[in-house]
Amino acid sequence: MDDQNIRLNIAGHARYEYSEVARSYVPMHWHDALELIYILSGELTVETEQRRWQLHAGQCICISPYVLHATISLFGNTALLLQIPTEELGDFAPETRSRQFIWDVETTNPTMTAAIERVKQKLLQMQHTASSDSPFRDIRMASLLLEITYLLYEEFSCPVTEGSIFRREKNRQRLSAVIAYTEAHYRENIALSDAAATLHMHPNSFCRFFKENTGVTYLNYLNEYRLSKVHEDLVTTDAALHEILEKHGFTNYKLFRHMFAERFHTTPGRMREELR
């Protein structure tokens, strides 16, 4: 079986994917799942509210559930992806809610380095198994999923307090409401007061809350989301740039040019030429 862009559901809900992309850009988002990304070739930049990682071949990152993150690859990559939903994590270990996962891509700690290597080896075994024609492939994939989950809990998880759990879940519910509102209305002229109203907060309090919990301002998040939609249409359609900008609510052309150059290190016209 060909490896290219294989996607499999494991044990019902977990998702494995072998992916080859020429370039990609996904704005700030989160999953109701723990996510592992293992770069086999190429590069990928991962940004969270706390840090920015430039991943290259052989590096692997673990992103905890509900952690806002963005990914961008300017030159493409080949990667293995595994997403384990929190519901499934809870089935394996009921105390999931009271634990968090700590994974340092650039660690020099020998114990953590060895543990990361073991996880990477299991992911490579998943790749080999997923591309096989064995009638027992699904059994082996489920077995590897359990082994990886065990390693994640045993080597990378630590307990959190009840107070931290309460604050985290309350903030997650609030952010979910804001993100849902933004995705539904981003084409419109959204004011800070509009977004703040979704949480019944004063705009100043809302700005502090959003920045503290995402690492970016709300307006930056909104425009990054618009930029991702513009980028998607730019590389998949022949529509004129001004039509795409109007479609996705990007009315400030100067800001768009600045953000596009900062994010992609090129111009919209050059990007389209490179894709032809």
Where do the language-model regions lie?
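Generic protein-terminus/edge-of-domain signal
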Residues: 1-60, 67, 73-75, 94-102, ...
